[in-house]
């Protein structure tokens, strides 16, 4: 995203309360890619000056993206079981995807699983914009049509498991996330993403006390990210065409802890 002409690291992006950054040196996996669109419950944007309570450390803006809050059974309902599923197909590029979620909840406990997958081949323009031919000189069998936009294919899979437990005044929630992107090609870049595996652990506590409210969060995210020339790009370089690609392998880790307390001093004053 871009806010007031500022983007990338000039924006602070929080996904389910986690301050995430791009593990890729070329920023091919921006923070918003860590959550599937079908899991988004709310989006808040603080443009310009950002409150300290949401980070405060950004030039352009702070963007908060959160999954839906845990659902519990109503009083006297017993157990709640619900789910949803969706799918799509797009003729251009033969794009397709599916998503599903399932929830099991009582009055004190909530368990939810989300899964999604999407993939597509190269998409096509409205008409020919180039001559048809091989994708590269060292790939004569990889044929691209005159209307085909090379290096525009992708494949992604996302899984999430959330568990929450509550009492009268307290709530504990744990989220586990797994992302697997075998490939995501870029028609406007020299390199493609040839692998992206991410694991996320997110633990949250919220409690109400006689003196006020306490919130705490601890999280850890690990990403293994790989880049190289994809199937639609020249792979062999050099004077003798003997330099194989330009592999880049990155491992990124992000660990964070946040504690926030609201102390009620009077009906008018609160100390945070």
Where are these regions (language model features)?
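Short acidic/polar hinge/loop motifs at secondary-structure boundaries
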Residues: 20-49
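Transmembrane beta-barrel domains of outer membrane proteins
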Residues: 4, 46, 66, 99-105, ...
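Extracellular loop and loop/strand-boundary signature of outer-membrane beta-barrel proteins
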Residues: 27, 86-87, 144-149, 184-192, ...
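Periplasmic-side early beta-strands and strand-to-turn transitions of outer-membrane beta-barrels
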Residues: 71-72, 79-86, 90-196
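Hydrophobic, lipid-facing positions within transmembrane beta-strands of outer-membrane proteins
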Residues: 59-61, 81, 96-100, 109, ...
